[in-house]
């Protein structure tokens, strides 16, 4: 009985890590337009899920902060392979997804470092932003 109970107890109490990084696809990020939009070498445009960063253009633009955010994100992921968790596509045809590098959530890092904020309207799409 103990032989059956111990593995079951371990399975129930061990934390589950979402996502399973080894099963996520890998993409090569060419560059990032701003703090929440990147492009792969294949031309896929990725809108980083669950965050909002300052805009370069438009009514609510803050070009100085937007360039700082863009530079930070480019240092993190440009010209590098990252894992991607694709969630959906937006009305502009961009992939909405989470990026991971060395099993670290890029969006979470952007928010922690102050280059973006949790996009409350879509925060339910990402486990880390629900907390």
Regions found by a protein language model. Name each.
Residues 2-131:
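Small beta-barrel nucleic-acid-binding modules, primarily SNase/OB-fold domains
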């Amino acid at each position: 009985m103990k032989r059956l109970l111990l593995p079951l107890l371990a399975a129930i109490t061990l934390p589950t890590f979402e996502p399973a990084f080894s099963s996520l696809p890998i993409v090569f990020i060419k560059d990032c337009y701003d703090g929440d939009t990147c492009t792969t070498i294949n031309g896929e445009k990725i809108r980083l899920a669950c965050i909002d960063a300052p805009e370069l253009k438009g009514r609510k633009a803050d070009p100085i902060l937007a360039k700082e955010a863009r530079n930070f994100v480019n240092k993190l992921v440009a010209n590098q392979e990252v894992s991607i968790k694709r969630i959906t596509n937006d009305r502009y045809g961009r992939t909405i997804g989470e990026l991971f590098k060395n099993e670290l959530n890029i969006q979470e890092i952007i928010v922690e470092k102050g280059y973006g904020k949790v996009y409350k309207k879509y925060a339910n799409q990402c486990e880390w932003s629900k907390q």
